[in-house]
From Swiss-Prot:
Binds DNA. Interacts with SUMO conjugating enzyme UBC9/UBE2I. Interacts with the telomeric protein TERF2IP. Liver, skeletal and heart muscle, mammary cells. Very low levels in brain, lung, placenta and kidney. Strongly overexpressed in many pancreas and colorectal cancers. Increased gene copy numbers are detected in 3 of 12 tumor cell lines and 2 of 12 primary pancreatic carcinomas. Overexpressed in 80% of colorectal cancers. GO terms for biological process: regulation of DNA-templated transcription; regulation of transcription by RNA polymerase II. One of its GO terms (cellular component) is cytosol. Sumoylated. There is a cross-link at K28, K51, K56, K173 (Glycyl lysine isopeptide (Lys-Gly) (interchain with G-Cter in SUMO2)). GO terms for molecular function: DNA binding; DNA-binding transcription factor activity, RNA polymerase II-specific; heparin binding; RNA polymerase II cis-regulatory region sequence-specific DNA binding; zinc ion binding. This is Zinc finger protein OZF. Gene3D superfamilies: Classic Zinc Finger. It comes from Homo sapiens. Pfam families: zf-C2H2.
Length: 292
């Protein structure tokens, strides 16, 4: 390190300023790397996978994902990480620290990125667009998972029955069928659920809370998924298309029912006469024949 560089560190002198945002640096090389943020230039490329970064420090951090090296270990639980900032974020789970709070509803988060994604539930912003069907998402990870519908990729397989899923969360939900575990119980009525999110939605039955409101007609819903489906009644969007006949649907569940026309699948069987049905509603209607 040169004598001049050392002097700047001790004096706190930062003579190099960014013309775009005004941020100052002690070295011109640091300013040059910073300016890549504004120009979106990514000159630092990973030799393993070709992924590019705006700063050298980020490509160095990224390369740890290929080596598998995890130098940073949590003192509480022993879990290790390839990057120090990932360890610091993880440690907040143990401390309960949630420094990033939503100004609209007060909900707090461990990570700033989670707060930004959450705030989109208030603004309705969905900047990530599927190139196949045009469906939009508030988070990039949601788009990535959705895209598996189009390519037919189902990498998450149940070890019990072999059923495969495009998204990990659906596999986890499915596995509770085999275990029967329902650890989340409602304090109001005692009803138990296998998933925490299901309990949260259920509690709204008692509270009457409907936080998701349609910007077009003002109708409110207890679940964001219900609002998403409802909005399609205004837009006419039908993102779920049948590969057999091309018919499109606004809900995935409706497409799943429709597919049984082509597959001939009839999972609902009458215990009285053995007649089978493709839809549960048809099965229930049929059973009334035997009760009358």
């Amino acid at each position: 390190m040169s004598h001049l560089s050392q002097q700047r560190i001790y004096s706190g002198e930062n003579p190099f300023a960014c013309k775009v945002c005004g941020k100052v640096f002690s070295h011109k090389s640091n300013l040059t790397e910073h300016e890549h943020f504004h120009t979106r230039e990514k000159p630092f490329e990973c030799n393993e996978c070709g992924k590019a970064f705006s700063q050298k420090q980020y490509v160095i951090k990224h390369q740890n994902t290929h080596t598998g090296e995890k130098l940073f270990e949590c003192n509480e639980c022993g879990k290790s990480f390839s990057q120090k900032e990932n360890l610091l974020t993880h440690q907040k789970i143990h401390t309960g620290e949630k420094p990033f709070e939503c100004k609209d509803c007060g909900k707090a988060f461990i990570q700033k990125s989670n707060l930004i994604r959450h705030q989109r539930t208030h603004t309705g912003e969905k900047p990530f667009v599927c190139k196949e069907c045009g469906k939009t998402f508030s988070g990039k990870s949601n788009l990535t998972e959705h895209e598996k519908i189009h390519i037919g990729e189902k990498p998450f397989k149940c070890s019990e029955c072999g059923t495969a899923f495009g998204q990990k969360k659906y596999l986890i939900k499915h596995q509770n069928i085999h275990t029967g575990e329902k650890p989340y119980e409602c304090n109001e009525c005692g009803k138990a659920f296998s998933q925490r999110t299901s309990l949260i939605v259920h509690v709204r039955i008692h509270s009457g809370d409907k936080p998701y409101e349609c910007n077009v007609c003002g109708k409110a819903f207890s679940q964001s998924s219900s609002l998403t489906v409802h909005v399609r009644s205004h837009t006419g969007e039908k993102p779920y298309g049948c590969n057999e006949c091309g018919k499109a649907f606004s809900q995935f569940s409706t497409l799943a029912l429709h597919l049984r026309i082509h597959t001939g699948k009839k999972p609902y069987q009458c215990s009285e006469c053995g007649k089978a049905f493709s839809q549960k509603s048809h099965h229930i209607r049929h059973q009334k024949i035997h009760t009358h």
